[in-house]
Amino acid sequence: MYKQIFFSVLMAVSPLGADCCTNLIVGKDASTDGSVMCTYSADDYGMFQNLCHYPAARHPKGTMRQVYDWDTNAYNGQIPESPVTYNVIGNINEYQVTIAETTFGGREEMVDSTGTLDYGSLIYIGLQRSRTAREAIEVMTTLAERYGYNSYGETFTICDPDEAWIMEMMGCGPGSKSVVWVAVRIPDNAICAHANQSRIRKFDRKDKDNVMYSKNVVSFARSKGWYDGTDADFDFCSTYAAPDFGGRRWCEARVWSFFNRFAKSMDKYVPYAEGHSPNAEPMPLWIVPERKLSLADLEAAMRDHYEGTPFALDKPGDIGGGIWQMPYRPTPLEYEVDGQKCFNERPISTQQAGFVFVSQMRSWLPRQIGGVLWFANDDANMVPFTPIYCCVNKPPHCYDTPGADAVTFSPDNAFWIQNWVSNMVYPRYSQMFPALRAVRDSLDSAYIAFQPEAEARASELYAQSADKAVAYLNGYSAKCAEEMLGRWKKLAVFLIVKYNDMTVKPDSCGRFLRSPHGLGATVERPGYPAAYAREMEKLKK
């Protein structure tokens, strides 16, 4: 069996086992249609997440907001509520502001468990209180500085129809109720990504239009003896969350794979992403792609398994994917065999995704129509994305199903139906995935193709009244989601019938064949794929 061997200086610096996510970002001049786009794969084992909704509201003076930890649901305290809060559906609000995240951990001693706000609270409160990305940064940092931040180090994606930003934040230690943070605007013609490793290094403190930071971002490091250089040379990542082997191989390699899709120059950063060379040149925060990216490009990037790269999961001799070579691996990522430490690769697409999205933000359309959260409730590779417009004020039933949760199955719930199908396909991937992909791609293509027509109709209604457009887009978003659920249920039935008991029943155009006497046609018994059989026989010798 092909083995990956641990780098000798692997260190446990961050809680990567619990919160491993990926964000991809596209500036408006780097997209094919002028959209700002960003993505989120929320990856956490055991995670069950509905499409959340916070309705727009006005709050009387003196109203307090209860704060519950997003990961644990533990009560953290309360803060004064804002007089006005905006409609939020998933991770986009009615002004098209979108916020996502990945956890990088950083120095353990900087965590302040006494803070009131966790990273999830900052996201959803920020969405409820902001109309632009810059305003969201101000809201989130002001709240963290006033009430304390209790999570590990975090990278936030913060976008609106005109700008894309990333912000990194860490606490200042137990009881401090203080944070260090820096936010950098991604150039309009660039793409960026982050994946559980701090990415902001040096930043131009004089560039007030494109850089924001806390007053203590450098002085705090000096006070701890972690930095003694000039302000201009200060490196946020190296000081507060220097990448170890895992930070490079399991995290930065995902960024590399995204960049590698759109730039031929990424070969020189392979040594950095591999994690073995301590002096390898780090990747830039962003790159200018060699071509502009479409919505479909981002959906495809979210399904990445390092195909055709040095990190591919289908290398010759690697039987870790099982008989039918799934591009997934059991976790934890690291494991031990006869005293030798080994590890698996960690691609963008991963089985523990609770939900995924591609957010599309467009400045030239009315805000109710311009923002679309292309949403799915499982690993991006195994599901289609359905459109949820930012004005939606009632989540589709399949994305918010009463009674369904992490331990309660519901046939009406997208998470459970999508996971049901995925978990049939994973162990027999090369056999069953083509059938899944055909349905997935047909739905993706149909929704993207119909988008102009749907938005033309919404625009006609908007000319009459915004409420009519909102009602139409609520109905359209729900229709697409329920159509997807129906197709996925049919797919589940097809798969269990066709591939029952490790056989393959013949079919034609989706209809199973019968014998001349009305019985099921003779099944095929495919046996081992040739590559797997060859490796298995090698192990016997």
Language model features: what each stretch is:
Residues 4-14:
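Sec-dependent N-terminal signal peptides
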